[in-house]
Amino acid sequence: MIAEQTATVLPRLQPDDAVDLHLHTLASDGFWTPAELVSFLADHHFRVASICDHDSQRSVLEAMQLGDELGVHIIPGVEVTTNWSGRQWHLLVYGIRPDRSDDDAAEFLAILAELDAELRANAEDARQRIEASGKPLPSLSEVAAGRPVWPFHVLSTAIKEGHVKNLTEAANLVTQLGGSFTADAPLERTVHAAHMAGGICVIAHPGRGDSVGAVTEADLDRMLASIPIDGLEAHYRSYTDAQTALYRRLAFDRGLLVSCGSDSHAPNQPVNPRPFQANWCAGLLARLGVPVTIPNSAVWEPGMDPLAAKPEESKQESPNGSPDVVEATTS
């Protein structure tokens, strides 16, 4: 089964219609509620977006329903924490609904369930270690707010209680106490399961180069030799034009799709959803049932994105310990 066979075909988008295919909510380490996020998208005239929480699709169905009501097409997605070649990789998987009950989707949904169970266990272990060290966490239930308690909530509670200043210090505290926040699935297994379910697999933020590490051309070729990933997130909030050009070239030279995402976690954290032009990722959108009119002029070239980072701005992000500092270890 492939995504084209199961996607709902939408009216054709214009080349400059706004899309953002990498957004987070409070289902993982974000602070947008589905209602707040979809309302923002509608108010700012986005046509298509994708909710890609870390290892969770708990917000997807609500966001899809709200999107239908407000005129924003929400593509089901998830950012799966995977491992390959001795390190973690964030994999954006598009096109798989969390309410699937068919055999084709069973393995992929099982991977997410396994990650959820491991994250809950890691969170409870971290809580016990922190409290045993004399640092109580009485507001943990308040911080989790009825959601499954994941490591991110434990870290956030440690900050709220004044035990540490930021997420990086919180993660270091748990590591020093012998705990772990790592939960990931084998990349090859995840891609295979996603493809069985009709999903499309895109390597997230290959040029970011902070806690999750940048992707080199050699990395990509070694990966493609054994794992059939489908694309690269070649447009990203922190990329300069030179980085976007590099990852578009790496994708096109290898027949890969291109995705566009802000990685917004909350209002202005690190950024609001970005209005990427639909034609910049038209191939991916078409595979997901969203056709795009291709302009007669250049699809993308340097200078087209007014929000592209300047070279001096393209540095390691989140120096003060915002969620991206510890994404690789906390999901």
What are these regions (language model features)?
Residues 1-39, 44-46, 58-76, 80-100, ...:
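Charged catalytic cores and adjacent phosphate/nucleic-acid-binding surfaces used
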Residues 97-133:
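Polyanionic/metal-chelating signatures
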Residues 111, 140, 171-178, 204-205:
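Short, flexible active-site loops
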Residues 120-168:
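Extended, charge-rich helix/loop segments that form flexible
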Residues 144-148, 176-185:
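Active-site glycine- and acidic-residue-rich loops that bind
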Residues 158-163, 173-179:
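Terminal or standalone catalytic/regulatory effector modules within metabolic enzymes
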Residues 181-195:
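Short, acidic loop-to-helix structural element flanking the phosphoryl-transfer center
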